[in-house]
Amino acid sequence: MKFFGWMQNKLNGDHNRTSTSSASSHHVKQEPREEFSDWPHALLAIGTFGTTSNSVSENESKNVHEEIEAEKKCTAQSEQEEEPSSSVNLEDFTPEEVGKLQKELMKLLSRTKKRKSDVNRELMKNLPLDRFLNCPSSLEVDRRISNALSAVVDSSEENKEEDMERTINVILGRCKEISIESKNNKKKRDISKNSVSYLFKKIFVCADGISTAPSPSLRDTLQESRMEKLLKMMLHKKINAQASSKPTSLTTKRYLQDKKQLSLKSEEEETSERRSSSDGYKWVKTDSDFIVLEI
């Protein structure tokens, strides 16, 4: 707010100076007219009066010069007095206040631009009134029309150019994205086609066909066949040995069991024989009281 007050004081001081200087000069110029207005024109035509009028005019011109110099001195003194006060006021501001003042000035400038645009619109609206009221000044009306139209056309052209640039940039970016996507899709398709064609070649190509792998030599085939035969023989032997080992174990078990049973039977028979031999001849009593020798 201090800054705005200082600006207003400066502006008001300049206007007052200009008005006072103009008023003083106008007043000085009007004084001789008022003095000579009462005198008759015949007296001025005489030579004696003409000489006196010249001397009076010279004195008045000197007085005017003196007054102008005095006013210049006064203005210089007032400017010298205002300059330190303005510097003091500027020193009192902080950087935050300066930033706020800059923002306010930007707002004022934007408002002035808006006002100018509003004025141009009003001029465009009030064109028939201007033509009607200022009929002799048709050239000025035409100039105003041309200026307003040029301003409007320039602003519209600038906006159109900006819009066109934006749309062009958007279109170019989209085209780049589409081209990149199409390239990636083509690469994927080529890879899939190559893989499928390679598989078909592998499946359907004959031994003497266009196969990329080299054909095996006779030595390799012979060596492979010999090794395969040996491996097969080894496997067969192992399998037969395992199969034969299983029934032998069973037969041995059965044989041993049979041996045990036979041994048990033989032992039982021997024991029975021994018992019979140990008993010898026995007397057996019967109901008929006959003695029978049982062997």
Curated annotation (Swiss-Prot):
General function of this protein: Involved in the regulation of root gravitropism. Functions redundantly with LAZY3 and LAZY4 in the control of root gravitropism. Functions redundantly with LAZY1, LAZY3 and LAZY4 to control plant architecture by coupling gravity sensing to the formation of auxin gradients. Involved redundantly with LAZY1 and LAZY4 in the regulation of both shoot and root gravitropism. Mediates gravity signaling in statocytes downstream of amyloplast displacement, leading to the generation of asymmetric auxin distribution in gravity-responding organs.
Family (UniProt): Belongs to the LAZY family.
Key words, A-Z: Growth regulation
Skewed-composition ranges (Basic and acidic residues): 59-74
Motif IGT motif location, chain numbering: 42-48
Signal sequence extent: none
Protein's UniProt keywords contain Protease: no
Tissue specificity statement from the Swiss-Prot or TrEMBL entry: Expressed in the endodermis of inflorescence stems and hypocotyls. Highly expressed in hypocotyls and root tips of young seedlings.
Region (Disordered): 1-36, 51-89, 260-280
Name used for this protein in its record: Protein LAZY 2
Species of origin: Arabidopsis thaliana
